[in-house]
Amino acid sequence: MAFFRTVTKLRSRLGQPPSLRDSVRCLQTQASSDLDLHSQLKELIPEQQERLKKLKKEHGKVQLGTITVDMVIGGMRGMTGLLWETSLLDPDEGIRFRGLSIPECQKVLPGATPGGEPLPEGLLWLLLTGKVPSRSKNMHYPVNNGVVPKFQIMCSRPLMLCLLEHIPMTQFTTGVMALQVQSEFQKAYDKGIPKSRYWEPTYEDSLSLIAQLPVVASYVYRRIYKGGRMIPVDDSLDYGGNFSHLLGFDDHKMQELMRLYVTIHSDHEGGNVSAHTGHLVASALSDPFLSFAAALNGLAGPLHGLANQEVLLWIKSVVDECGENITKDQLKDYVWKTLNSGKVVPGFGHGVLRKTDPRYTCQREFALKHLPDDPLFRLVSKLYDVVPPILTELGKVKNPWPNVDAHSGVLLNHFGLTEARYFTVLFGVSRSIGIGSQLIWDRALGLPLERPKSVTMESLESFCKKAAS
């Protein structure tokens, strides 16, 4: 377990504040002090417990809004009902991680090189503590060859029972479930650990899970697509760099892309299917391994995590039919053809956002810097000009702008990761950082079992009749 203990501490003895701290509004949270992650949380948790206690005591009866019938039968969209500390989604500005926008995170979070993409480790620290970790040569992903034999014992045997024809997400979830045997929370709960200390084994499990996922995910990839030969971890690399390496991609630009990809896909507040599922299952005191496996099954749905693969497949269908040098007029015709056939144009629109997704924007900037002449990137750029006006003309779409999925597949494809069915696994590895961080705070704050009230259509009809009389 030494490997996972060192991961949870990130081997950080951090001292110097980031040089751009004062230029970013949200850095009122202050830079991290010279404490390891566990110690910082131990200091922060009592303060936040008192804050929550005061909030409940003084404002517990304050109404946050009105629940309508549309909300009840429309997937609870727009209904405020979850406490989620790690991020907040603004319809116009996009996601903020502990108050920091994506561009701000790119400025202040440490990178593998000066000016490079943020390290996922830095974002993990930010989500857990609300503080920006200082740039340090010691802030890296400490890998140890011991993870490979441990993985082979726990995961490779169950995964060998999966058919190669099983979708990658099925195999990935199987691997996560196989890791559950090492849950510290389950062991501690069975021994009667007091509720006030639930967060500590949850912390161990969550950080252990996050650390192991690149190995599990890369094994799934190489088992399905590369004949099953695993690649040893490289203990000189960070989390994102090692994930790229384990998959078989050692290009520096691909490693930078993986750092960016994991960071921007890590969290998107608590109402989306995967995040809500993880929170819901964990509210029953299921350990982080079980809770995250449940979240992955939600992520595997076509309306959630499968969208990124569908975008790339749709873009390739455009190229197959019209060629790489398609004009904007031809593209308009193809978009209308898609819509008139009863299908949607994947990668556009969002349940909450009402402007272009900042996660799309930062990926576009990455493409302009590293692959400006890629044919599929040029096609994505044309789609940005063509699709929103058409969707606006239809009048049925609240947000006609591109989301994160409109771009990610093209970037991965450029560097050789062309297997679209695997993309959701990458999403899953990324999302573990947000879900795992919030699960720790769920237990630290003592959040209760989730149990909303359900109704029947008959009861709704009866209520509405009484309200109208």
Curated annotation (Swiss-Prot):
Q: What is its EC number?
A: 2.3.3.16
The record's keywords, sorted A to Z, are: Mitochondrion, Transferase, Transit peptide, Tricarboxylic acid cycle
Q: Which Gene3D superfamilies match?
A: Citrate Synthase, domain 1 (1.10.580.10), Cytochrome P450-Terp, domain 2 (1.10.230.10)
Q: Where is it mostly found?
A: mitochondrion
Q: Where in the cell is it found?
A: Mitochondrion matrix
Its UniProt entry gives the catalysed reaction(s) as: oxaloacetate + acetyl-CoA + H2O = citrate + CoA + H(+)
> What pathway or pathways are given for this protein in its record?
Carbohydrate metabolism; tricarboxylic acid cycle; isocitrate from oxaloacetate: step 1/2
Active-site positions on this chain: H304, H350, D405
Q: Which InterPro entries match?
A: Citrate_synth-like_lrg_a-sub (IPR016142), Citrate_synth-like_sm_a-sub (IPR016143), Citrate_synthase (IPR002020), Citrate_synthase_AS (IPR019810), Citrate_synthase_euk (IPR010109), Citrate_synthase_sf (IPR036969)
An MF annotation (GO) of this entry: citrate (Si)-synthase activity
GO process terms (BP): carbohydrate metabolic process; citrate metabolic process; tricarboxylic acid cycle
GO CC terms: mitochondrial matrix
| Annotated transit peptide | 1-28
Miscellaneous notes: Citrate synthase is found in nearly all cells capable of oxidative metabolism.
Q: Which family does it belong to?
A: Belongs to the citrate synthase family.
Quaternary context: Homodimer.
Name of this chain's protein: Citrate synthase, mitochondrial
Q: Which organism is it from?
A: Fragaria ananassa (Strawberry)
Q: What is the lineage of its organism?
A: Eukaryota, Viridiplantae, Streptophyta, Embryophyta, Tracheophyta
